[in-house]
């Protein structure tokens, strides 16, 4: 795959899908316009909900002057995401066994053309380190799911996707707890913004001899809450208390009666 490892952020984004570079790189492209000057993306406050991973997110931000004038350098939120239409079409065809190269060329490969990514074929090479969904998938369906994760990242689709795929096994992967690797370069980038480890620093976690930002401080690598059961209440969200009060015919979803 050409993956260079996680010694530095530069290594992580090298030789990868261009959308990863577009999403988290802040060293080679401007982030927004401020006082008519293109500025780089500051490292995120990794103690806040928007930056728990430690990676700076540049999605939905534009360094175009016209965007700054019109929308204060942010894109409008997608109400109708055409890319999701293309992705779900490809996925449905793959599930039905009707996904041909023509289908891929009309759907996923349209998205890949936008970023200069090589086309997906109906007979992709198997991933050597696949995500463990808890069951086997065809190589094609696996790649379509990965495409969905890449294209729609940070847009609010992931949890619903995992639920409808019955794929909560992915949370048992310890890598889901790990944020950015803490290296001297990262500590320098975060100087004045955050410190890592110690009594007052952001929580870190050791994994395979390396130190990482701990994304979810309430979750250890062996936390039993990472495992979902068939009757886990988290499959459904709790109904709002005010709605239950307004409509006495409504009953709370299973397992949430104490909330």
Question: Can you annotate each of these PLM segments?
Answer:
Residues 1-259:
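Acidic/polar-rich alpha-helix caps and helix-coil junctions
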């Amino acid at each position: 795959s050409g993956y260079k490892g996680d010694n530095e952020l530069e290594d992580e984004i090298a030789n990868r899908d261009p959308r990863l570079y577009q999403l988290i790189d802040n060293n080679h492209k401007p982030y927004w316009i401020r006082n008519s000057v293109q500025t780089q993306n500051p490292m995120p406050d990794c103690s806040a909900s928007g930056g728990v991973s430690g990676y700076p997110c540049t999605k939905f931000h534009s360094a175009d002057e016209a965007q700054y004038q019109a929308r204060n350098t942010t894109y409008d939120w997608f109400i109708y995401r055409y890319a999701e239409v293309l992705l779900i079409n490809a996925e449905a065809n793959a599930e039905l066994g009707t996904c041909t190269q023509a289908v891929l060329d009309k759907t996923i490969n349209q998205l890949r053309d936008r970023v200069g990514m090589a086309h997906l074929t109906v007979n992709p090479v198997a991933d050597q380190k696949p995500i463990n969904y808890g069951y086997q998938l065809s190589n094609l369906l696996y790649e379509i799911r990965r495409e969905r994760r890449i294209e729609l990242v940070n847009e609010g689709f992931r949890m619903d996707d995992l639920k409808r795929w019955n794929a909560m096994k992915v949370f048992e992967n310890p890598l889901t707890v790990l944020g950015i690797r803490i290296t001297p370069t990262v500590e320098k980038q975060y100087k004045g913004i955050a410190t890592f480890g110690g009594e007052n620093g952001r929580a870190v976690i050791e994994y395979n001899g390396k130190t990482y930002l701990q994304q979810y401080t309430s979750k250890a690598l062996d936390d039993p809450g990472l495992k979902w059961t068939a009757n886990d209440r988290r499959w459904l969200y709790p109904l709002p208390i005010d709605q239950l009060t307004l409509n006495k015919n409504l009953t709370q979803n299973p397992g949430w009666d104490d909330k």
